[in-house]
């Protein structure tokens, strides 16, 4: 199983490597230019349309749900743990500048989201039950001149969408909920699993109309409360905000930037900020993935372009608003780069070899033999049993020593950090991720890891709201993740319907999907995460081919709709 996990992890790293990120953002850039930047120019119109009374009714055109409900159901699937965990992870792995690259990817992602949603409505069908069925798979099947090629692409998209729905849209979300409730409120995972499964069944069995009703209430409310709480954190830490914002932009474009003081000990290059910012941004808003288009196809509308604009705002609300709130909370609270002591133990030196006996937080002891050598400015530790396992460490700046004690995060077992120097193993060192390694003079050893993910966001909210901040983030994760489960169920169901060319099996999918929620809440999911990441990437490839192939049609329809926009503005 471990070998399988390594293989899947390697494949995941490849498919989500630079090529995929360039394709996703590059397609957005190409479409934005091809459409004459109309998505940017008409963003105000799109936001106004989204918040209008007409968007909440089914009075204009045909469809299953209101335009606003179609948007909120799509947002239910995209506003998830990525907005809380993903942003924090990006800012640790890629530095504070990753937030800027999330904004950049979202700016061009607006056009990708518009395009896939507009096409989904234009080429949707009415199934035997009288319900709308649409999405990239229908677009590929009906719009491509080479019908066989389009049919194959559509089938592949639907297959990977079903796989992704059970992975990143279900089990991983349920797992995030159960872990959060377990760590914050000590709720047993099986209890969380049972409750989630029951609620999922009650809502999902009702289909898109029930899901959209719940989403149209829960999604706006949870987003509003999260934004308000985030603004409180930012206001309380307002004195740090200017420096935090400067650091965000400085580290986004520096060839090599080092963050100290406010933003901790994160050391990154511009490419790192770009890589993690774009990747987390895409995971958060799913622009170019094609998933949101499946929900958009259910909207009641008289013009595909009109609904395309409404669904396009999902990327704005998701990344430009919610992710930005999380990022500014982290930047202004001074928690980025803070570490916690996760490993203690001892070490023994023999010539150029050192044996480290480490005890982790679960009291598991690991003994590793290393050889060590010094370069001009680094300490290199190489595992004697696995030469590919190498640690490259640098001297920890003196102003970062014992920073954890100042923030009262260090455990009682912490080893006092001391200044290291090239030529001597003794002292405190740091790796590229900001983790601290301390070899004390008395032979004791400690490793302090950088806090990231949900824990980092909880710390940032706690800086202003205390323990309540942690509760708030946990509740946010629960609501965001559960809404993602609901939204992705509909995505997967419609893809499932496409594969079997019938709606007759939809109820089987709904029940099966709901029961899998329990599995996700109660088991370890490293392998599932990687599998679902791969499925997500493989969904994106046929969708991007579709968007590029139909770019001329997208631009034509969009430009023709300009007359409608002008007429509507003139009449008001």
Write out the residue ranges for each language-model feature.
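N-terminal alpha-helical transmembrane segments of multi-pass membrane transport
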Residues: 1-81, 91-98, 109, 389-395, ...
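Flexible loop linkers connecting adjacent transmembrane helices
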Residues: 37-65, 89, 94-99, 103, ...
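Lipid interaction determinants
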Residues: 340-442
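Membrane-interface loop-to-helix entry segments
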Residues: 23-30, 35-47, 157, 174-181, ...
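Helix-loop-helix module between adjacent transmembrane segments
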Residues: 27, 31-32, 105-130, 137, ...
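Transmembrane helix-loop junctions in multi-pass membrane proteins
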Residues: 3-4, 34-39, 82-87, 165-178, ...
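Alpha-helical membrane segments and immediately flanking helix-loop junctions
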Residues: 57-92, 119-143, 159-162, 263-316
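Extracellular/periplasmic helix-exit of transmembrane alpha-helices
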Residues: 116-124, 128, 229-249, 255-265, ...
